[in-house]
Design a protein with these regions (language model features):
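Non-catalytic signal-transmission and effector/linker regions of two-component phosphorelay proteins
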Residues: 1-5, 110-123
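Conserved acidic carboxylate
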Residues: 10
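Charged docking surfaces used in two-component/phosphorelay signaling
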Residues: 17-25
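Short hydrophobic/Thr-rich beta-strand motif most characteristic of the beta2 strand and flanking loop
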Residues: 27-34, 42
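Acidic catalytic/metal-coordinating carboxylates
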Residues: 35, 61-67
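Active-site residues of response regulator receiver
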Residues: 54, 84
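The feature encodes the CheY-like receiver
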Residues: 58, 88
Length: 123
């Protein structure tokens, strides 16, 4: 069985590194991109099985990236986990059309929450 790949789109390098570490410890290949342009390139290069996306990115919002990803039929099916400080303001039902399967609240999440979210969307 091939190792599943997780793309982390996060402009906080420390947080991205923490997520990479916990995902790799749990058997996933994890790569990160600090902004939307690098994320598009990483999707093309890595063909991730799931994307963890910060909503508030430097230079572009996660929502702009969601729109971009959904405009490409070959990658529109990649499940998205939003990771944000704004989780209480978002409804999963409103974001489902954009491929969002889970929303993680950065203000309360633990490393194990990231792994659990990835597992749940890859079932």
């Amino acid at each position: 069985m091939k190792t599943q790949t997780v793309l982390i789109v996060e402009d906080d390098a420390w947080l991205a590194e923490q997520q990479i570490r916990v995902l790799e410890k749990n058997g996933y290949k994890a790569v990160s991109s600090p902004h939307a342009i690098a994320a598009i390139e990483a999707v093309d290069d890595e063909h991730p099985d799931v994307i963890i996306l910060d909503v508030l990115l430097t230079g572009s919002t996660g929502f702009a990236l969601l729109h971009e990803l959904q405009s490409h039929t070959d990658i529109a099916g990649i499940p998205i986990i939003l990771c944000t400080n704004l989780a209480s303001d978002m409804k999963l039902d409103d974001l489902n059309p954009y491929g969002v399967k889970r929303i993680l609240d950065k203000t309360t999440m633990e490393p194990s929450d990231v792994v659990a979210a990835v597992r749940s969307v890859l079932l």
